[in-house]
Amino acid sequence: MQPAIQAEGLVKRFGRNTALGGIDLTAEEGTVLGMLGPNGAGKTTAVRLLLGLISPDAGRVRVLGRDPRTADARTRIGAMLQVARVPEALLVREHLDLFSSYYPRPLALAEVIHRAGLEDIVNRRFGELSGGQKQRALFALAICGDPDLVFLDEPTVGMDLHSRRQVWEEIRRLAAAGKSVLLTTHYLEEADKLAHRIVVIDEGRLLRAGTPEEIKRAVSGRRIRCVTRLDPDLVRRLPSVISVQRDRDATVVFAESPEQVVRSMLGEDDSLHGLEVSAAPLEEAFLALTGGNAART
């Protein structure tokens, strides 16, 4: 079975800026690949390369075993991008009819409307919709052709909780039907719940790839939280420490060997208290891997 996505050594430069510095990506058929990274990490560039919208300066891309720029590949791909420009004067129903015409075997209109939850807006003009409603309509356009591979770039931004969970169920349904999904998201809970594998990208480099559990273990899955008078810079210099953050009055440490770190901290501060050692949630693992750049996410 060939991978749905196979990219090797992807490099893309814009002038002197290297947006991608030679990354490899693989997504198997019937799986959801989650792509995480701060703004400016290279996620959008990677998606555009995989869709064949731009060409790499080096490396090779295949989707469904084909060059993504070919007509054969494009009739088997659906995409929902962050920046989508569609005529605002058309009704949502008219957009669905138009996009469905691009595919050889599109889904029935009634099925698309139901799966994307468009019953209340299908006869409204696109320009009249709220941000969350537009996202639902764009999701419908991505799946209306019954594609084998779907690119979803921040699909649930602006949606209410009910709509977000409805899209989650549809993503699960796509994978269960043997479709493949590449999902970029700022909602780390979304990646944790939906993705079979996750890749973490920052500054054009692939930092880590694995299952959600493997990503959590990549920061040694160990999160130390305590109240200490030790300076965070001192804690950062201790062996096996990956990152140190402040959480109100507490210090939060990610470490490969938590026992060693706790012993060292107790040796320096016998007043240390409120000690907790636990597995790292995906959000905190992500922040640790990307250097805690929360402001960039």
PLM ranges: what are they?
Residues 14, 100-103, 116, 219, ...:
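A broad structural signal for alpha-helix termini and local helix breaks/kinks
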Residues 2-3, 220:
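Residue-level preference for beta-strand/loop junctions
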Residues 221-297:
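Short, charged/small-residue-rich alpha-helical element at the C-terminal edge
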Residues 168-256:
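ABC transporter nucleotide-binding domain
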Residues 3-7, 12-202, 208:
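ABC transporter nucleotide-binding domains
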Residues 92, 109, 212, 274, ...:
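Structural motif detector for alpha-helix initiation sites
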Residues 58, 72, 94, 111, ...:
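An acidic, carboxylate-rich microenvironment
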